[in-house]
Amino acid sequence: MTRKSRARILTAASIALLTSSADLIAQAPAKPPLPDAPIARLIAQSAIQSDTQPVIPAPSAVTGQSPAALASTQPSTSNPRLTRAEAEAMATKKNPRVTVARLLALAQHQVVRETRAAELPTGLASITAVDADNATRISAGSLTSSRLFEHAGAGGGFTQLITDFGRTRNLVASSKLQEKAQNANALATTEDIVIATDQAFYNALQAQALLKVSQQNVDTRQTTDTQVNEMTKNKLKSTLDSSFADVNLSQAKLLLLDAQNNADSTMAALDAVLGLDRQVTYELVDDNAPLQPPPPDVDNLVQTGLQQRPDLQALHYDQQAAVKFSHAQHDQLFPTISAAGTAGSVPIRPAEYYVANWWGAIGVNMNIPVFNGFLYTSQAKEASIRAEAASEQSRNLRDQIVRDIRTSWLAANTAYQRVAVTAELLKQANLALGLAQTRYQLGLSSIVELSQAQFQQTDAAIGNTNAQYQYRLALATLNYQIGATP
């Protein structure tokens, strides 16, 4: 075999080896992406396609906009519009937890009236008619007057507590404090529903925005896939480029499914907070207000929270009510003095047994506790211990409020700083994507580099959008922690 023949064989073998390697790479399955949020892998919207040379889509102006601008890029649908303020008002009106808390407060007011009834006189009236054999006697049963007479009469009586040395007064005071505690709990429940509504609203708003981005991502990847496949047919790009474009399109479709499921789930959560028993899909409207930095002084926020938090006020009232009830239990050891009276008329009566046709009497009674197996002393001790426990519960919640306000303030500051950082990151990602597109169009880089730049740009755009929502939610959480009235 001549040297020239050997050179031809080696050249042909090298070309065959390179061709088979390229085909193997193109046919190899794409490496599965690392588990991450779907929003981290969304792709930007494509630009207008050129007539002569296929152009890779430019960075989407939509994904780099604010959440409100992103929502406004889509045509309005027939779904009802809903703002955050409207959602809060609807939730506080229709959510069953708020209704239950208000009803319990109304019920506690009736407990106050029930307790106060012991201080008021009790009156009753009676009408009695008896048909009996005169002078016969009851010989079995309870210990009562044994003689029976035919008679008919009507009368009335009353009882009035004179004093029980403060027991009833302390019971009334305790029930009034419990009513205040229940009203504070109702307000705390309302604030819980408001913050839950804000969380559900922003989650659903974010999910709707990401659903629109994912749909644009599918359109972009479809355009890119069509362009690259056409260039591959014309021998302008390799099979590897076409394979990467197909993989990116499949990933975009999967992300669209995830985004749709996330949007439906968050909307279902919002419907539940709003107190709806059916599915209603709203078109959520952001307030589009400029972002303001959080308050600079956390100590003032702590003092405000300790003064305004309704759940802390409820525990204070509960502790005071427990103290009053403890005093009332101690007062059981004192005597109880009450008055009683009765009067009436007997128009039908046997004259030989009745000296008058009416009766009347009034008197005063004193009950003095002597011994009942240490019941009163044990009840008094139990009430004192429970009052101390209520005081410690109030102190524990106070410490938690101080901690929660400080951590919420730190989270709000961090979220506010992330808005500026993610905006700068988005700016740099847009610049990097533009350079990567230019290099790919000039044939200086592969589609892998372009895809990586597109991923980074989309990740930065979604991160900037998320940062704005997270800061709004962080401010709402901070207002909740300081007890701001919704």
What are these regions (language model features)?
Residues 2-12, 19, 24-51, 133, ...:
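Acidic, low-complexity, intrinsically disordered peripheral segments
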Residues 26-128, 278, 285-319, 370, ...:
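Bacterial Sec-pathway N-terminal export signals of envelope proteins
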Residues 89-99, 106-122, 156-174, 184-191, ...:
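A glycine-/polar-enriched beta->alpha junction
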Residues 117, 251-276, 415, 424-484:
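Short segments within alpha-helical structural elements
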Residues 189-304, 411, 415, 456-457, ...:
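Periplasmic alpha-helical coiled-coil/stalk elements that build and connect Gram-negative outer-membrane
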Residues 238, 401, 408, 443-446:
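Alpha-helical heptad-repeat coiled-coil segments that mediate oligomerization/polymerization in large
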